[in-house]
Amino acid sequence: MTETADIVVIGAGASGLGFANWYRELHPGATVLVLEADAEPGGYCKTIVQDGFVWDYSGHFFHFKEPEIEAYLRARMPGQEIKTVTKRSLIRYAGVDIDFPFQKNIHQLPREEFLECLVDLYFRPSSKVEGAPASFAEMLYQRLGVSITEKFLRPYNEKLYAIELEKLDPDAMGRFFPKADVADIIANMRPKQPGAGDGAYNATFTYPAGGAIQYIRALLRDLPPGTVAYNEPVVQIDLGAREVVTPKRRIGFGKVVSSAPLPMLARMTGVAHDASVFTSNQVLVFNLGFDRKGYKNVHWMYFPDRSVSFYRVGWYDNIFDTDRMSLYVELGAPHGAMFDVDALRARVLGDLIREGIVDDHQLVSHHHVVLDPAYVHVTQASLVETQRVRDGLALAGVHSVGRYGGWTYCSIEDNLIETRALARSI
């Protein structure tokens, strides 16, 4: 006999668990079943505790816009030390550390390069003459000029996305791209007040001492036992029979809410789609623990230099001021690239030494993980196909949510806001 559930949720990450909570609050008598392919919850919000270090799969910090959501999570994390931090981010440019974002801090560059950026900013191409930008690269040149684009924004983002910026949509990063016009850039040349943020979406962040998994545990707290089935991947969704198929069983459903990557969901449902438009990068993350403290008063550092293996380094130890340097180091690569992890770890350590982040430190613990997909490539073609596929699936009672279900660039809080709205509407 086929089992049934009012709602089948695919994925026990922030999006799936968030939806399960919102929906059960509105419909206490509903049967909600969450299917998770992995042995543990969290998706990419997993935490590794090793040799006294606490690492996430990568730096998953919450940047709350809605006090209601922050309060909801905090109420379900009793006893957990949670710190709200004013972010300090630096860019390592030609051996000089300047504040993030680059475009608002060009006055910190050596004089000749500052003047170069300023002149190119003033004489940047105009959209009134050249028309609206057709790509992310064109948007950068039109908005910020040649020098700012080519000194930082182009090399950094191409290291991250592992793709030419001409292929990305002009609004590929949405609100996450630090906006700055000429007036902003000039105004930022005034001395900053102590403790002032950088004006970015994540100028402050919130982080629990136990790592990002604490947010997942908060979302699990109110769900009844048996709500989440682990080690149970979905292999097919039979839209005609309205059944979800796993290696263990068939489950009849009223509706499906999926946080799986959209092209995977399209394959599971047999819905026609253009797989070629759904491209992404992958990110190799090294979590590195050292025997003693290193840099202080920095949380992120960005590296546009293409000769440096990584594009970003983050310091966990500077959030809670612990006494041993604890880093996450991120390397971008095209989807499908193969990693020689040992060789890359050695290269990363060499680059950290050359950049002065590591000197005579001893590496005492390490971990790595590959995120694939990591950053999706938002293109004009992917936007159209994403909308078409999601709309078609929704008509069949299958709703695709989250960063990868929406094939977009968004925050964890955005996923909770999105799934709360969906729970209220279906």
Set out the residue ranges of the language-model regions:
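Mid-domain catalytic core of redox enzymes
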Residues: L26, E232-G356, L383-G392
